[in-house]
């Protein structure tokens, strides 16, 4: 299928809402920094403008699998990551330490990246989407499988949740694992599963 990127992506800042800053989201954010720098070096006038959304705080169990360090335990994930990259690369990206909520209007040069880990969260995101509009990338993984889908609600490129409605089926029972050590978590998911998913984004 041939797809043409809208002109607005080339002449305006590309607005990115990254929802979820856990195992996959924290790695996606580091990739967005590199993408921003690459776009600027290739002549894009603005690069990316990113807002990261996540109400969670860093816990001890996050260290190792996610991009956090011991001194950040107890702090909001979004604040840790956004402050780090803003300071290191002179960016002005935004941290929202809360659940994602809808905007009244999405410019044509908008991208939503969902890196959440539950059907309930995906269903909430889906409820905010207009009939067609922003590009939506859904990246998720289980113990041994992952998915990465993109869509904008058009007939040619439907939203991820139109392609795989089971992703937002809240009637399906979720796997609810308690927080555990890095060693214990490796018993049910490989160390680089999140990295693979983030790279696909």
Language model regions located:
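Glycine-rich adenosine-cofactor-binding loop
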Residues: 12-43, 51-59
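Glycine-rich phosphate-binding loop and adjoining beta1-alpha1-beta2 segment
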Residues: 46-90
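Conserved beta-strand segments of alpha/beta enzyme cores
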Residues: 49, 92-94, 135
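A structured beta-alpha segment of the ubiquitous adenosine-cofactor-binding alpha/beta core
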Residues: 73-109, 116-123
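Oxidoreductase and adenylate-handling cofactor-binding alpha/beta cores
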Residues: 199-201
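E1/E1-like adenylate-forming module used to activate ubiquitin-like modifiers
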Residues: 105-197
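N-terminal Rossmann-like NAD(P) cofactor-binding subdomain of oxidoreductases
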Residues: 44-45, 53, 116, 140
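Glycine/serine-rich phosphate-binding loop and adjoining beta1-alpha1 elements at the start
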Residues: 1-16, 189
